[in-house]
């Protein structure tokens, strides 16, 4: 997973450097001047996202959630294609899954980063909170290729609201005729 750690304050940079131990392939970017060669200087978060949004699989914003959301808004398209996004407070107490929790992997990333910091992961997707299957990950889990379905969100809503839900699977696994 190609991960960008976006740090806007000195405390955020310090936290990003700690995260490099758990995520050695991550790239730290910051608008703050810094002598550490591991930190890539950027002119602004807005400009960085405009040029790099499609080149990263995941973004971890360290700082205010509002900055994270406002910075991302112009680039968002669809939960099936948007990258994973998490947000951390600069003290490293909480790691919140913000965008593409299941399909993009933000929930898993939030848990992984929280574990590395001894922080609390904040996961708000209904299936995770209720400890239910993630229907949108079911096909990936089993190596299936799902057909595009505009109704998937409606099915997920029925499922997490404990309504009768049927999944029709046309699957040919190894060993089946």
Which positions does each model-derived feature cover?
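N-terminal beta-loop-helix "entrance" segment that forms/cooperates
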Residues: 28-51
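Gly/Ser/Thr-rich loops at beta-strand to alpha-helix junctions
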Residues: 5-14, 62-70, 79, 91-94, ...
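Short, solvent-exposed amphipathic alpha-helical segments in soluble enzyme
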Residues: 18-24, 74-80, 103, 138-139, ...
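Short coil/turn connectors at secondary-structure junctions
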Residues: 1-2, 24, 55-58, 80-84, ...
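Hydrophobic/aromatic-rich, well-ordered segments within soluble, folded domains that form packed cores
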Residues: 49-53, 58-87
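General beta-strand structural signal in soluble alpha/beta enzymes
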Residues: 27-31, 60-63, 87-88, 121-125, ...
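Internal alpha/beta core interface subdomains
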Residues: 101-177
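N-terminal basic/disordered segments at the start of proteins
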Residues: 1-33
